[in-house]
Amino acid sequence: MRSAAVLALLLCAGQVIALPVNSPMNKGDTEVMKCIVEVISDTLSKPSPMPVSKECFETLRGDERILSILRHQNLLKELQDLALQGAKERTHQQKKHSSYEDELSEVLEKPNDQAEPKEVTEEVSSKDAAEKRDDFKEVEKSDEDSDGDRPQASPGLGPGPKVEEDNQAPGEEEEAPSNAHPLASLPSPKYPGPQAKEDSEGPSQGPASREKGLSAEQGRQTEREEEEEKWEEAEAREKAVPEEESPPTAAFKPPPSLGNKETQRAAPGWPEDGAGKMGAEEAKPPEGKGEWAHSRQEEEEMARAPQVLFRGGKSGEPEQEEQLSKEWEDAKRWSKMDQLAKELTAEKRLEGEEEEEEDPDRSMRLSFRARGYGFRGPGLQLRRGWRPNSREDSVEAGLPLQVRGYPEEKKEEEGSANRRPEDQELESLSAIEAELEKVAHQLEELRRG
Protein backbone atom coordinates (compact mmCIF):
# COMPACT_ATOMS: atom_id res chain seq x y z
CA MET A 1 0.00 0.00 0.00
CA ARG A 2 2.71 2.29 0.91
CA SER A 3 4.59 1.61 -2.33
CA ALA A 4 1.53 2.33 -4.36
CA ALA A 5 1.06 5.61 -2.57
CA VAL A 6 4.69 6.59 -3.19
CA LEU A 7 4.41 5.85 -6.92
CA ALA A 8 1.26 7.91 -7.12
CA LEU A 9 3.00 10.82 -5.45
CA LEU A 10 5.93 10.54 -7.83
CA LEU A 11 3.67 10.56 -10.87
CA CYS A 12 1.84 13.60 -9.60
CA ALA A 13 5.10 15.38 -8.90
CA GLY A 14 6.34 14.59 -12.44
CA GLN A 15 3.19 15.91 -14.02
CA VAL A 16 3.37 19.04 -11.95
CA ILE A 17 6.97 19.62 -13.04
CA ALA A 18 6.08 18.99 -16.70
CA LEU A 19 3.23 21.55 -16.79
CA PRO A 20 4.32 25.12 -17.94
CA VAL A 21 4.13 27.94 -15.54
CA ASN A 22 2.40 31.06 -16.90
CA SER A 23 4.75 34.07 -16.30
CA PRO A 24 3.89 37.73 -17.18
CA MET A 25 6.39 37.65 -20.07
CA ASN A 26 4.73 34.61 -21.54
CA LYS A 27 1.37 36.29 -21.21
CA GLY A 28 2.54 39.31 -23.23
CA ASP A 29 4.03 37.13 -25.92
CA THR A 30 0.88 35.10 -26.23
CA GLU A 31 -1.19 38.25 -26.59
CA VAL A 32 1.17 39.59 -29.28
CA MET A 33 1.00 36.27 -31.11
CA LYS A 34 -2.78 36.36 -31.01
CA CYS A 35 -2.83 39.92 -32.37
CA ILE A 36 -0.41 38.98 -35.17
CA VAL A 37 -2.66 36.05 -36.06
CA GLU A 38 -5.66 38.39 -36.21
CA VAL A 39 -3.80 40.87 -38.50
CA ILE A 40 -2.65 38.09 -40.80
CA SER A 41 -6.12 36.61 -40.93
CA ASP A 42 -7.49 40.11 -41.69
CA THR A 43 -5.09 40.59 -44.63
CA LEU A 44 -5.75 37.13 -45.99
CA SER A 45 -9.54 37.38 -45.70
CA LYS A 46 -10.02 40.44 -47.94
CA PRO A 47 -13.26 39.50 -49.58
CA SER A 48 -14.75 38.90 -46.11
CA PRO A 49 -12.49 40.89 -43.76
CA MET A 50 -12.22 40.05 -40.13
CA PRO A 51 -11.86 43.27 -38.13
CA VAL A 52 -8.91 43.54 -35.74
CA SER A 53 -9.78 44.48 -32.19
CA LYS A 54 -8.57 47.71 -30.64
CA GLU A 55 -6.73 45.80 -27.93
CA CYS A 56 -4.62 44.08 -30.61
CA PHE A 57 -3.75 47.43 -32.22
CA GLU A 58 -2.67 48.79 -28.88
CA THR A 59 -0.54 45.73 -28.04
CA LEU A 60 1.11 45.78 -31.47
CA ARG A 61 1.84 49.50 -31.26
CA GLY A 62 3.32 49.11 -27.80
CA ASP A 63 5.53 46.14 -28.62
CA GLU A 64 9.08 47.20 -29.37
CA ARG A 65 9.91 44.16 -31.41
CA ILE A 66 7.18 44.88 -33.96
CA LEU A 67 8.30 48.54 -34.14
CA SER A 68 11.89 47.48 -34.80
CA ILE A 69 10.68 45.12 -37.52
CA LEU A 70 8.71 47.91 -39.16
CA ARG A 71 11.64 50.31 -38.85
CA HIS A 72 13.95 47.75 -40.38
CA GLN A 73 11.60 47.37 -43.29
CA ASN A 74 11.50 51.15 -43.78
CA LEU A 75 15.29 51.28 -43.63
CA LEU A 76 15.52 48.73 -46.38
CA LYS A 77 13.22 50.82 -48.54
CA GLU A 78 15.22 53.94 -47.79
CA LEU A 79 18.45 52.16 -48.64
CA GLN A 80 17.01 51.02 -51.92
CA ASP A 81 15.94 54.57 -52.70
CA LEU A 82 19.38 55.89 -51.79
CA ALA A 83 21.01 53.29 -54.00
CA LEU A 84 18.83 54.29 -56.95
CA GLN A 85 19.47 57.98 -56.32
CA GLY A 86 23.24 57.41 -56.11
CA ALA A 87 23.23 55.54 -59.40
CA LYS A 88 21.32 58.37 -61.05
CA GLU A 89 23.71 60.98 -59.65
CA ARG A 90 26.72 59.01 -60.85
CA THR A 91 25.40 58.81 -64.38
CA HIS A 92 24.61 62.54 -64.34
CA GLN A 93 28.10 63.37 -63.08
CA GLN A 94 29.66 61.18 -65.73
CA LYS A 95 27.68 63.01 -68.39
CA LYS A 96 28.73 66.38 -66.97
CA HIS A 97 32.38 65.32 -66.81
CA SER A 98 32.35 64.12 -70.40
CA SER A 99 30.69 67.35 -71.60
CA TYR A 100 33.20 69.42 -69.61
CA GLU A 101 36.08 67.51 -71.14
CA ASP A 102 34.63 68.10 -74.60
CA GLU A 103 34.33 71.81 -73.92
CA LEU A 104 37.90 71.97 -72.64
CA SER A 105 39.17 70.19 -75.71
CA GLU A 106 37.26 72.60 -77.95
CA VAL A 107 38.54 75.62 -76.04
CA LEU A 108 42.11 74.34 -76.20
CA GLU A 109 41.83 73.64 -79.91
CA LYS A 110 40.50 77.13 -80.70
CA PRO A 111 43.50 79.08 -79.28
CA ASN A 112 45.86 76.76 -81.09
CA ASP A 113 44.02 77.40 -84.35
CA GLN A 114 44.07 81.15 -83.67
CA ALA A 115 47.72 81.17 -82.60
CA GLU A 116 48.90 79.59 -85.85
CA PRO A 117 47.57 82.36 -88.15
CA LYS A 118 48.77 84.99 -85.66
CA GLU A 119 52.29 83.59 -85.82
CA VAL A 120 52.12 83.51 -89.60
CA THR A 121 50.90 87.12 -89.75
CA GLU A 122 53.59 88.24 -87.29
CA GLU A 123 56.29 86.59 -89.39
CA VAL A 124 54.91 88.17 -92.55
CA SER A 125 54.66 91.59 -90.88
CA SER A 126 58.24 91.36 -89.57
CA LYS A 127 59.50 90.41 -93.03
CA ASP A 128 57.55 93.28 -94.59
CA ALA A 129 58.94 95.71 -92.02
CA ALA A 130 62.51 94.53 -92.69
CA GLU A 131 62.01 94.87 -96.44
CA LYS A 132 60.53 98.36 -96.01
CA ARG A 133 63.49 99.43 -93.91
CA ASP A 134 65.94 98.12 -96.50
CA ASP A 135 64.08 99.90 -99.29
CA PHE A 136 63.95 103.11 -97.29
CA LYS A 137 67.69 102.92 -96.60
CA GLU A 138 68.39 102.40 -100.30
CA VAL A 139 66.20 105.37 -101.23
CA GLU A 140 67.92 107.56 -98.62
CA LYS A 141 71.36 106.52 -99.84
CA SER A 142 70.45 107.28 -103.44
CA ASP A 143 68.99 110.68 -102.45
CA GLU A 144 72.04 111.54 -100.37
CA ASP A 145 74.38 110.52 -103.20
CA SER A 146 72.48 112.62 -105.73
CA ASP A 147 72.22 115.59 -103.31
CA GLY A 148 75.85 115.28 -102.27
CA ASP A 149 77.23 115.23 -105.82
CA ARG A 150 75.23 118.13 -107.24
CA PRO A 151 76.37 120.87 -104.84
CA GLN A 152 79.98 119.94 -105.47
CA ALA A 153 79.56 121.04 -109.07
CA SER A 154 78.70 124.62 -108.16
CA PRO A 155 81.81 125.61 -106.12
CA GLY A 156 84.10 124.20 -108.79
CA LEU A 157 82.50 126.33 -111.49
CA GLY A 158 83.80 129.82 -111.35
CA PRO A 159 85.79 132.27 -113.43
CA GLY A 160 89.30 133.32 -112.55
CA PRO A 161 90.49 136.46 -110.83
CA LYS A 162 90.47 138.37 -114.10
CA VAL A 163 86.71 138.19 -114.12
CA GLU A 164 86.67 139.47 -110.55
CA GLU A 165 88.56 142.60 -111.55
CA ASP A 166 85.96 143.35 -114.21
CA ASN A 167 83.15 143.07 -111.68
CA GLN A 168 83.98 146.47 -110.14
CA ALA A 169 82.33 148.41 -112.98
CA PRO A 170 78.60 147.48 -112.63
CA GLY A 171 76.49 149.31 -110.04
CA GLU A 172 73.82 148.29 -107.62
CA GLU A 173 70.97 148.76 -110.09
CA GLU A 174 72.41 146.27 -112.58
CA GLU A 175 72.95 143.51 -110.03
CA ALA A 176 69.28 142.91 -109.23
CA PRO A 177 68.02 141.75 -112.70
CA SER A 178 71.14 139.72 -113.42
CA ASN A 179 71.02 137.83 -110.15
CA ALA A 180 67.27 137.33 -110.24
CA HIS A 181 67.56 135.47 -113.54
CA PRO A 182 69.21 132.22 -112.26
CA LEU A 183 66.83 132.07 -109.33
CA ALA A 184 63.87 131.96 -111.70
CA SER A 185 65.25 128.82 -113.33
CA LEU A 186 65.54 126.91 -110.06
CA PRO A 187 62.71 124.83 -108.57
CA SER A 188 61.31 126.10 -105.28
CA PRO A 189 60.40 123.74 -102.41
CA LYS A 190 56.99 125.38 -101.94
CA TYR A 191 55.92 124.69 -105.55
CA PRO A 192 56.78 121.09 -106.31
CA GLY A 193 57.65 120.06 -109.83
CA PRO A 194 56.17 117.28 -111.91
CA GLN A 195 58.07 114.70 -109.92
CA ALA A 196 56.18 115.60 -106.72
CA LYS A 197 52.92 115.58 -108.65
CA GLU A 198 53.69 112.12 -109.94
CA ASP A 199 54.51 111.02 -106.40
CA SER A 200 51.16 112.37 -105.21
CA GLU A 201 49.31 110.77 -108.10
CA GLY A 202 51.22 107.50 -107.77
CA PRO A 203 49.00 105.89 -105.08
CA SER A 204 45.89 106.64 -107.14
CA GLN A 205 47.16 104.58 -110.07
CA GLY A 206 46.40 100.90 -110.34
CA PRO A 207 48.27 98.26 -108.37
CA ALA A 208 49.80 96.90 -111.56
CA SER A 209 51.66 100.20 -112.06
CA ARG A 210 53.24 99.87 -108.60
CA GLU A 211 54.12 96.20 -108.57
CA LYS A 212 57.77 96.53 -109.57
CA GLY A 213 58.73 99.84 -108.00
CA LEU A 214 61.84 98.43 -106.40
CA SER A 215 63.25 97.25 -109.71
CA ALA A 216 62.53 100.70 -111.17
CA GLU A 217 64.34 102.33 -108.25
CA GLN A 218 67.36 100.12 -108.81
CA GLY A 219 67.36 101.12 -112.46
CA ARG A 220 67.19 104.75 -111.43
CA GLN A 221 70.10 104.28 -109.06
CA THR A 222 72.25 102.88 -111.85
CA GLU A 223 71.25 105.78 -114.09
CA ARG A 224 72.06 108.23 -111.32
CA GLU A 225 75.46 106.66 -110.82
CA GLU A 226 76.21 107.00 -114.53
CA GLU A 227 75.05 110.63 -114.48
CA GLU A 228 77.17 111.29 -111.39
CA GLU A 229 80.23 109.94 -113.18
CA LYS A 230 79.48 112.28 -116.08
CA TRP A 231 79.13 115.19 -113.65
CA GLU A 232 82.46 114.35 -112.03
CA GLU A 233 84.19 114.24 -115.42
CA ALA A 234 82.65 117.60 -116.37
CA GLU A 235 83.72 119.07 -113.02
CA ALA A 236 87.27 117.87 -113.50
CA ARG A 237 87.39 119.44 -116.95
CA GLU A 238 85.92 122.72 -115.76
CA LYS A 239 88.32 122.85 -112.81
CA ALA A 240 91.28 122.23 -115.09
CA VAL A 241 90.36 125.12 -117.42
CA PRO A 242 90.31 127.96 -114.83
CA GLU A 243 93.45 126.64 -113.14
CA GLU A 244 95.33 126.95 -116.43
CA GLU A 245 93.96 130.43 -117.10
CA SER A 246 94.23 131.92 -113.57
CA PRO A 247 97.48 133.45 -112.18
CA PRO A 248 99.20 131.91 -109.13
CA THR A 249 97.70 134.54 -106.80
CA ALA A 250 94.45 132.58 -106.70
CA ALA A 251 96.01 129.87 -104.54
CA PHE A 252 95.59 131.63 -101.20
CA LYS A 253 92.09 133.00 -101.86
CA PRO A 254 88.99 131.33 -100.46
CA PRO A 255 86.43 130.22 -103.05
CA PRO A 256 83.82 132.90 -103.75
CA SER A 257 80.25 132.45 -102.64
CA LEU A 258 77.43 131.77 -105.02
CA GLY A 259 76.30 135.37 -104.95
CA ASN A 260 79.78 136.41 -106.12
CA LYS A 261 79.64 133.78 -108.83
CA GLU A 262 76.38 135.10 -110.19
CA THR A 263 77.73 138.67 -110.31
CA GLN A 264 80.95 137.44 -111.90
CA ARG A 265 79.09 135.61 -114.61
CA ALA A 266 77.00 138.65 -115.42
CA ALA A 267 79.93 141.12 -115.23
CA PRO A 268 82.11 140.72 -118.40
CA GLY A 269 79.68 142.12 -120.95
CA TRP A 270 77.93 144.79 -118.89
CA PRO A 271 77.65 148.24 -120.38
CA GLU A 272 75.38 150.82 -118.78
CA ASP A 273 72.56 150.67 -121.33
CA GLY A 274 69.71 148.14 -121.54
CA ALA A 275 71.07 146.28 -124.57
CA GLY A 276 74.22 145.50 -122.66
CA LYS A 277 72.17 143.97 -119.88
CA MET A 278 70.44 141.61 -122.29
CA GLY A 279 73.77 140.61 -123.79
CA ALA A 280 75.21 139.92 -120.37
CA GLU A 281 72.27 137.75 -119.47
CA GLU A 282 72.66 135.81 -122.71
CA ALA A 283 76.41 135.44 -122.12
CA LYS A 284 75.95 133.68 -118.75
CA PRO A 285 76.93 130.01 -118.62
CA PRO A 286 73.67 128.03 -118.25
CA GLU A 287 74.64 126.23 -115.05
CA GLY A 288 71.23 126.56 -113.37
CA LYS A 289 69.47 125.67 -116.60
CA GLY A 290 71.66 122.61 -117.01
CA GLU A 291 70.75 121.44 -113.52
CA TRP A 292 67.08 122.10 -114.21
CA ALA A 293 67.28 120.16 -117.50
CA HIS A 294 69.03 117.36 -115.66
CA SER A 295 66.25 117.21 -113.05
CA ARG A 296 63.62 117.35 -115.82
CA GLN A 297 65.28 114.40 -117.53
CA GLU A 298 65.21 112.41 -114.29
CA GLU A 299 61.52 113.23 -113.80
CA GLU A 300 60.68 112.10 -117.34
CA GLU A 301 62.53 108.82 -116.75
CA MET A 302 60.65 108.31 -113.48
CA ALA A 303 57.38 109.01 -115.29
CA ARG A 304 58.21 106.48 -117.99
CA ALA A 305 59.09 103.70 -115.54
CA PRO A 306 55.55 103.23 -114.07
CA GLN A 307 54.06 103.18 -117.59
CA VAL A 308 56.43 100.39 -118.65
CA LEU A 309 55.59 98.52 -115.48
CA PHE A 310 51.88 99.02 -116.15
CA ARG A 311 52.22 97.50 -119.61
CA GLY A 312 54.41 94.55 -118.75
CA GLY A 313 53.30 93.70 -115.20
CA LYS A 314 49.87 92.21 -115.88
CA SER A 315 51.09 88.60 -115.93
CA GLY A 316 52.23 88.54 -112.27
CA GLU A 317 50.40 86.81 -109.51
CA PRO A 318 47.88 88.90 -107.51
CA GLU A 319 49.61 88.31 -104.19
CA GLN A 320 52.96 89.51 -105.48
CA GLU A 321 51.25 92.50 -107.07
CA GLU A 322 49.64 93.51 -103.79
CA GLN A 323 52.88 93.07 -101.86
CA LEU A 324 54.92 95.05 -104.36
CA SER A 325 52.28 97.78 -104.49
CA LYS A 326 52.40 98.10 -100.70
CA GLU A 327 56.19 98.31 -100.75
CA TRP A 328 56.06 100.91 -103.52
CA GLU A 329 53.58 103.02 -101.53
CA ASP A 330 55.75 102.78 -98.41
CA ALA A 331 58.88 103.78 -100.33
CA LYS A 332 57.06 106.80 -101.77
CA ARG A 333 55.79 107.67 -98.33
CA TRP A 334 59.31 107.59 -96.81
CA SER A 335 60.75 109.63 -99.71
CA LYS A 336 58.01 112.26 -99.25
CA MET A 337 58.80 112.43 -95.54
CA ASP A 338 62.50 112.93 -96.33
CA GLN A 339 61.66 115.71 -98.80
CA LEU A 340 59.40 117.42 -96.25
CA ALA A 341 62.14 117.26 -93.61
CA LYS A 342 64.67 118.77 -96.05
CA GLU A 343 62.26 121.56 -96.98
CA LEU A 344 61.57 122.35 -93.31
CA THR A 345 65.28 122.55 -92.50
CA ALA A 346 65.84 124.79 -95.55
CA GLU A 347 63.02 127.13 -94.52
CA LYS A 348 64.32 127.34 -90.95
CA ARG A 349 67.80 128.17 -92.16
CA LEU A 350 66.41 130.87 -94.45
CA GLU A 351 64.45 132.37 -91.55
CA GLY A 352 67.61 132.47 -89.44
CA GLU A 353 69.42 134.25 -92.26
CA GLU A 354 66.66 136.85 -92.62
CA GLU A 355 66.96 137.61 -88.91
CA GLU A 356 70.71 138.16 -89.28
CA GLU A 357 70.54 140.40 -92.37
CA GLU A 358 71.64 143.42 -90.32
CA ASP A 359 75.12 141.91 -89.92
CA PRO A 360 77.36 143.33 -92.75
CA ASP A 361 79.76 140.35 -92.66
CA ARG A 362 76.99 137.84 -93.37
CA SER A 363 77.92 137.26 -97.03
CA MET A 364 81.53 136.42 -96.16
CA ARG A 365 80.36 134.05 -93.45
CA LEU A 366 78.11 132.32 -95.95
CA SER A 367 81.02 131.94 -98.38
CA PHE A 368 83.18 130.33 -95.70
CA ARG A 369 80.32 128.12 -94.56
CA ALA A 370 79.67 127.00 -98.12
CA ARG A 371 83.34 126.11 -98.45
CA GLY A 372 83.81 124.42 -95.06
CA TYR A 373 80.59 122.55 -94.49
CA GLY A 374 78.91 121.99 -97.85
CA PHE A 375 75.13 122.14 -97.90
CA ARG A 376 72.90 119.46 -99.30
CA GLY A 377 71.25 120.84 -102.41
CA PRO A 378 72.03 123.48 -105.06
CA GLY A 379 68.89 125.40 -104.14
CA LEU A 380 70.12 125.95 -100.61
CA GLN A 381 73.51 127.20 -101.76
CA LEU A 382 72.00 129.70 -104.17
CA ARG A 383 69.63 130.96 -101.51
CA ARG A 384 72.44 131.36 -99.00
CA GLY A 385 74.71 133.09 -101.52
CA TRP A 386 72.07 135.47 -102.93
CA ARG A 387 69.72 137.69 -100.95
CA PRO A 388 67.97 140.31 -103.11
CA ASN A 389 66.51 142.14 -100.08
CA SER A 390 69.84 143.40 -98.71
CA ARG A 391 71.71 145.43 -101.32
CA GLU A 392 74.67 146.14 -99.07
CA ASP A 393 75.41 142.43 -98.65
CA SER A 394 75.03 141.81 -102.38
CA VAL A 395 77.43 144.67 -103.19
CA GLU A 396 79.96 143.32 -100.71
CA ALA A 397 79.54 139.83 -102.15
CA GLY A 398 80.04 141.16 -105.69
CA LEU A 399 83.29 143.00 -104.93
CA PRO A 400 86.48 141.12 -105.82
CA LEU A 401 88.69 139.94 -103.03
CA GLN A 402 91.87 141.48 -104.46
CA VAL A 403 90.63 145.04 -103.93
CA ARG A 404 89.98 144.48 -100.23
CA GLY A 405 93.56 143.59 -99.60
CA TYR A 406 95.44 140.90 -97.78
CA PRO A 407 95.06 142.24 -94.18
CA GLU A 408 91.29 142.46 -94.59
CA GLU A 409 91.25 138.85 -95.71
CA LYS A 410 93.22 137.91 -92.62
CA LYS A 411 90.73 139.71 -90.39
CA GLU A 412 87.78 138.07 -92.11
CA GLU A 413 89.39 134.65 -91.81
CA GLU A 414 89.98 135.22 -88.09
CA GLY A 415 86.38 136.37 -87.62
CA SER A 416 85.07 133.40 -89.54
CA ALA A 417 87.24 131.08 -87.44
CA ASN A 418 85.67 132.59 -84.32
CA ARG A 419 82.20 132.21 -85.76
CA ARG A 420 82.65 128.62 -86.93
CA PRO A 421 81.79 127.02 -83.56
CA GLU A 422 78.56 129.07 -83.48
CA ASP A 423 77.73 127.98 -87.02
CA GLN A 424 78.48 124.38 -86.11
CA GLU A 425 76.15 124.61 -83.13
CA LEU A 426 73.41 126.13 -85.30
CA GLU A 427 73.81 123.41 -87.90
CA SER A 428 73.81 120.67 -85.27
CA LEU A 429 70.63 122.12 -83.74
CA SER A 430 68.96 122.31 -87.15
CA ALA A 431 69.99 118.71 -87.88
CA ILE A 432 68.55 117.57 -84.53
CA GLU A 433 65.30 119.43 -85.26
CA ALA A 434 65.13 117.81 -88.68
CA GLU A 435 65.62 114.35 -87.16
CA LEU A 436 62.92 115.02 -84.56
CA GLU A 437 60.52 116.16 -87.27
CA LYS A 438 61.29 113.04 -89.27
CA VAL A 439 60.55 110.86 -86.25
CA ALA A 440 57.30 112.75 -85.62
CA HIS A 441 56.21 112.30 -89.23
CA GLN A 442 57.07 108.60 -89.05
CA LEU A 443 55.03 108.18 -85.87
CA GLU A 444 52.05 109.94 -87.45
CA GLU A 445 52.29 107.72 -90.53
CA LEU A 446 52.51 104.60 -88.38
CA ARG A 447 49.44 105.67 -86.37
CA ARG A 448 47.48 106.35 -89.52
CA GLY A 449 48.63 103.09 -91.13
Swiss-Prot record:
Glycans are attached at S185, S204, T249, S416. Keywords: Amidation, Antibiotic, Antimicrobial, Calcium, Cleavage on pair of basic residues, Cytoplasmic vesicle, Disulfide bond, Fungicide, Glycoprotein, Oxidation, Phosphoprotein, Proteoglycan, Secreted, Signal. One of its GO terms (biological process) is defense response to fungus. The modification Methionine sulfoxide is found at M364. InterPro entries: Chromogranin_AB (IPR001819), Chromogranin_CS (IPR018054), Granin (IPR001990). Residues 87-431 are annotated as: Disordered. Residues 107-140, 233-242, 279-297, 323-351, 406-423 have a biased composition (Basic and acidic residues). GO terms for cellular component: chromaffin granule; extracellular region; extracellular space; neuronal dense core vesicle; secretory granule; transport vesicle. Self-interacts; self-assembly is promoted in vitro by chondroitin sulfate attachment which occurs at mildly acidic pH conditions. Interacts with SCG3. Interacts with ITPR1 in the secretory granules. Binds calcium with a low-affinity. This is Chromogranin-A. It comes from Bos taurus. The gene is CHGA.
